[in-house]
Amino acid sequence: MASRPECGHERNMATIRQAEAHQGEGGIGLSLHGNRLRVIETGPGLRQTLVELIDGAQASLKLYYYIFAGDGSGRLILDRLVAARARGVAVTLMIDAFGSADTPVHFFDPLVAAGGHFGRFGARRSTRYLIRNHQKLAIADDRRLLMGGFNVEDDYFGVPPEDCWHDLGLLVEGPQVQAMTSWYGQLWRWVSTRGQRFRTLRRMVRNWRQPHHDADGPMRWVIGGPTRRLSPWAQMVKHDLERAGRLDMVAAYFSPGRGMLKRIATAARRQGARLILPSRSDNGATVAAARLLYGPLLKRGVEIFEYQSCKLHMKLIVVDDAVYIGSANFDMRSLFLNLEIMLRVEDAGFASAMRGFIDRRAKESRQVTLETHRAQRSLPTLVKQWISYFLVGFLDYTVTRRLNFRNPDAD
């Protein structure tokens, strides 16, 4: 483990017009309670924004990525972090040991040699290794933050364009970043502890409260992680869905349980529900598992589209006037097990703009109807879908929970 870090209003509601006015300047944007938010819609834009965030840092950089690859993009970002250290910026980088398993630890030696701090989540080889930290964020000077579903790897930055991941990022500037700085500090202390005790991690997730949070404010950070019930971020989505009039969702991995499926169907009966899901992925079982669920949803009026342009890695939920952007998928792992970060923004103008964004993704997708779904559902296809759902939606989830929750005091 590398060295530990040193210890050390007026509401401006966005309107649809304000959000659209930022489209030509690199994405949808708004100002809210002294915070500026900007949506980054393209892979090259994500990489450019991350580089600019690092190069613009004056005092500190704090990064966590599930995957940090040793490819061209990984070397570029690592080089920028080393350059930041050379100009006196304190740099801390954490990665997930499972997600970044293909990247040798010595790849990060230049950062440690430059005086940066480096740690791996889940480095201890035990059943705890099955618990993954799926969060992705970069914080500069505790005032600017870039988050979303993307990792540090060529595929997420549009390289190559014909087979990349289509993802989303959100740049946040303002006082709301302090909450994630606080969470990052807790996470670094846990990663820096030799034992990386599971009980401590569960307590962190269960007890985390956003510092200085205004319960009536429009912005709220929600954390996900391994608890005995639905993950905290998913509990909030559940609460919104139970009262939802309209639901629009873009999900890279979709295999929720029956309760969530019923809530989606209920929204469809009210004002409508639309899902944009992948037509292809790095793991074909995840696509097949999602397709097993299409029939019951289509029968209940849910609109389903499969994205065609490239692989889909986006995590975006719009429930009435609330928008969720972050790292969490809508599968059993993200709903119950993985550490996740989502930002919930409640603003009618922002929600409308993000629905417009989803409209554009729908135009790049193929709509699945009940007729086309039934026409493609042969017996071999159905067997494949059931096996895939068993593996993705049941076995992985069940085994991980039983190994790690068999004794809440065990480590």
Please place each PLM-identified region on the residue numbering.
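Charged, low-complexity intrinsically disordered terminal segments
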Residues: 2, 6-411
